[in-house]
UniProtKB/Swiss-Prot annotation:
This protein's encoding gene: rnpA
Domain of life: Bacteria
One function term, GO molecular function aspect: 3'-tRNA processing endoribonuclease activity
Family annotation (SUPFAM superfamilies): Ribosomal protein S5 domain 2-like (SSF54211)
Organism: Acinetobacter baumannii (strain SDF)
Enzyme class: hydrolase
Protein name: Ribonuclease P protein component
PROSITE patterns (alphabetical): RIBONUCLEASE_P (PS00648)
Ranges annotated as spanning the membrane: none
Length: 131
């Protein structure tokens, strides 16, 4: 049971080419007041997460770390619910350091739900269009 909810290296986008692939070929975009989610379907066996927190957007290191920690934790809990395997890159927007953890979780939760709906909707459309 613990392995199901772990956040191993298999669930992380690690190399620059994989990040570039998501940025260039993003099939889904989910906007939140303080986040932008880019996602694309992948052939990898698992959904994977990449987090990009630029110093330009969030100045203080402890705030960048807090955002990354909350995004990873939220992904870890929602990842088993995805209908298909997707690569997701999460990018915070300016002003994110002023909101509380509860508000961050709420925005992340809403974004994951929307992403799950988009992925399920897309996976239903693709097989019928190939026949």
């Amino acid at each position: 049971m613990m392995a199901l909810y772990s956040f191993s290296t298999d669930l992380r986008i690690r190399c620059a080419a994989d990040y570039k692939s998501v940025f260039d070929d993003a099939l889904f975009k989910v906007h939140q007041p303080h986040f932008l989610f880019l996602a694309k379907l992948t052939e990898q066996p698992n959904s994977r997460l990449g987090i990009v927190v630029a110093k330009k957007k969030v100045r203080r290191a402890h705030e960048r770390n807090r955002i990354k920690r909350l995004a990873r934790e939220s992904f870890r809990l929602h990842q088993p619910k995805f209908g298909s395997d997707i690569d997701v890159v999460v990018m915070p927007k300016v002003g994110i350091e002023t909101i509380t953890n509860a508000e961050l979780y709420q925005q992340l939760d809403f974004a994951w739900q929307k992403l799950q709906r988009l992925a399920k909707k897309h996976s239903k459309v693709v097989p019928t269009s190939q026949n």
